[in-house]
């Protein structure tokens, strides 16, 4: 009888028990070693996780205890960033890092592809992943990953001969064990054979047929698979798979190949839209109708409607619903522009600004409206513009009957009737109806004047002030 073991390594000594025979196998990697191994696979300084460099600093790499302690403090500060993060955020980082460490290998690999901000986002992502896999991808217990027990019981114990004994592990020659723990039943003695492919065979006439029971969930799933791979088969190419999760991964490659047939997808400047079209958006926001591919993205989006903004800038007091928004905003104060154009060397604060700029070098055709010929740099702006021609104004105000094409416009309009001013200045407590009005007001306290005249160098707080000033130069040139 041959049993396919899959990826199970060589077996440990065989022990005889009252119920049957038990083979216990220890994994060659501990849980901590697996966690360190999966911290990240980046090769560059920026790609390597800061927590990994903090955890793996060795005393031999330093000149003494003082330098070792100093380097640990610096690495910990770079990782946790106490100057920008609160105590709750630092605690969440530590919990999230430990949570990723105790997860199984395949789940760790998937989670590290997405830059999640909190443990709650990771839990939502895993729950969403379980729904996508249809319940077939069972989560493995980390304790079971350390030990995999195989119980082999005889189906006919009454026929067992008293002379049958277990051959000790030391009796097997070393070269034979290296080939796969080769053991067989000869002259009434049990010898278990494992070839190089990981198969276990039992032979010999005195030995009775044996039943195999697997306690590990991984082995349960392997033995429960059909002999012929007919249940998990690709509907397009007919390729068969042992596990349903492998079939889902394979079918996702087909979805990426099938791009949306909409007209906006034909533009070469819309690779982001093509990625969106490769997957369905099954999670919809009940407030504004916006749909998302993952439930974690929906939870993050709903913070906007709830008004929850836990991340605050220490420089100007501006608050954000997401940590990524705060980090992006901090570049305004620091002047950091990390996105570099390889063609002209110009730097940008945001990646979207770099992508928009690179269209100048690539000479990509902008998104053009077929009705009026107006061009836009982004497909989203074109979609909003096309609603003007289609007269699609499905959102109506119950107070005055005015209609709007976007839900966000209707929400802003409602504040006129209700008098709601949700955006408050943290310095003087003055409230505003629009966030843009608050941003203009904060510049008064910060004495910030971002709009500068290219001719005389005079700066202004608002764009309208710059336009009025430029008219003055224009009149002088005409005179």
Curated annotation (Swiss-Prot):
One Pfam family here: SCAN
Xref: SUPFAM superfamilies: beta-beta-alpha zinc fingers, Retrovirus capsid dimerization domain-like
InterPro entries (alphabetical): SCAN_dom, SCAN_sf, Znf_C2H2_sf, Znf_C2H2_type
Key words, A-Z: Isopeptide bond, Metal-binding, Nucleus, Repeat, Transcription, Transcription regulation, Ubl conjugation, Zinc, Zinc-finger
GO process terms (BP): regulation of transcription by RNA polymerase II
Biased composition (Basic and acidic residues): 174-187
GO annotation, cellular component aspect: nucleus
Disordered, as annotated region: 155-187
GO MF annotation terms: DNA-binding transcription factor activity, RNA polymerase II-specific; RNA polymerase II cis-regulatory region sequence-specific DNA binding; zinc ion binding
Zinc finger intervals, C2H2-type: 232-254, 283-305, 311-333, 339-361, 367-389, 395-417, 423-445, 451-473
Signal peptide feature range: none
Cross-link Glycyl lysine isopeptide (Lys-Gly) (interchain with G-Cter in SUMO2): where in chain: 17
Subcellular location: Nucleus
Keyword Mitochondrion (UniProt): no
Main location: nucleus
SCAN box domain span: 51-133
PANTHER family, per the entry: ZINC FINGER AND SCAN DOMAIN-CONTAINING, ZINC FINGER PROTEIN ZFP2
Function: May be involved in transcriptional regulation.
Name by which UniProt lists this protein: Zinc finger and SCAN domain-containing protein 26
Species whose genome carries this gene: Bos taurus
């Amino acid at each position: 009888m041959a049993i396919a073991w899959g990826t199970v390594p060589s077996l440990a000594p065989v022990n005889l028990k009252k119920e049957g025979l038990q083979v216990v196998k220890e994994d060659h990697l501990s849980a901590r070693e697996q966690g360190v191994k999966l911290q990240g696979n980046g090769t560059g300084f920026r790609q390597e996780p800061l927590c990994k460099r903090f955890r793996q600093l060795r005393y031999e790499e330093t000149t003494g205890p003082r330098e070792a302690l100093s380097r640990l403090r610096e690495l910990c500060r770079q990782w946790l960033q106490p100057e920008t993060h609160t105590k709750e955020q630092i605690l969440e980082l530590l919990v999230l890092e430990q949570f990723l460490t105790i997860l199984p290998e395949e789940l760790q690999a998937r989670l590290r592809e997405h830059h999640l901000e909190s443990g709650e986002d990771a839990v939502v992502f895993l729950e969403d992943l379980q729904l996508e896999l249809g319940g077939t991808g069972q989560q493995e217990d980390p304790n079971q990953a350390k030990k995999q027990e195989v119980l082999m019981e005889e189906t006919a114990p009454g026929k067992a001969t008293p002379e049958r004994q277990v051959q000790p592990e030391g009796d097997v020659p070393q070269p034979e064990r290296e080939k796969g723990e080769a053991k067989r039943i000869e002259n009434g003695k049990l010898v278990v054979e494992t070839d190089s492919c990981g198969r276990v065979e039992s032979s010999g006439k005195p030995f009775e047929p044996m039943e195999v029971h697997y306690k590990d969930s991984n082995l349960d799933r392997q033995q429960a698979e059909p002999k012929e791979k007919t249940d998990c088969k690709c509907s397009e190419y007919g390729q068969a798979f042992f596990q349903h999760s492998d079939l889902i991964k394979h079918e996702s490659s087909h979805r990426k190949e099938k791009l949306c047939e909409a007209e906006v997808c034909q533009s070469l400047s819309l690779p982001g839209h093509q990625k969106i079209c490769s997957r369905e958006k099954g999670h919809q926001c009940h407030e504004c109708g916006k749909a998302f591919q993952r439930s974690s993205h929906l939870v993050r989006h709903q913070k906007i409607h709830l008004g929850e903004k836990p991340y605050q800038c220490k420089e100007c007091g501006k608050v954000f619903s997401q940590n990524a928004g705060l980090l992006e905003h901090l570049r305004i104060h620091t002047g950091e522009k990390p996105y570099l154009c390889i063609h002209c060397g110009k730097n940008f604060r945001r990646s979207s600004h770099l992508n928009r700029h690179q269209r100048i070098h690539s000479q990509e055709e902008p998104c053009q409206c077929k009705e009026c010929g107006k061009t836009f740099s982004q497909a989203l702006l074109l979609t909003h513009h096309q609603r003007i021609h289609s007269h699609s104004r499905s959102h109506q105000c119950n107070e005055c009957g005015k209609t709007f094409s976007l839900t966000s416009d209707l929400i802003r309009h409602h504040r006129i009737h209700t008098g709601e001013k949700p955006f408050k200045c943290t310095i003087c407590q003055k409230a505003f109806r629009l966030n843009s009005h608050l941003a203009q007001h904060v510049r008064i306290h910060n004495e910030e004047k971002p709009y500068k005249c290219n001719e005389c160098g005079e700066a202004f707080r608002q764009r309208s002030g710059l336009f009025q000033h430029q008219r003055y130069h224009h009149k002088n040139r005409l005179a």
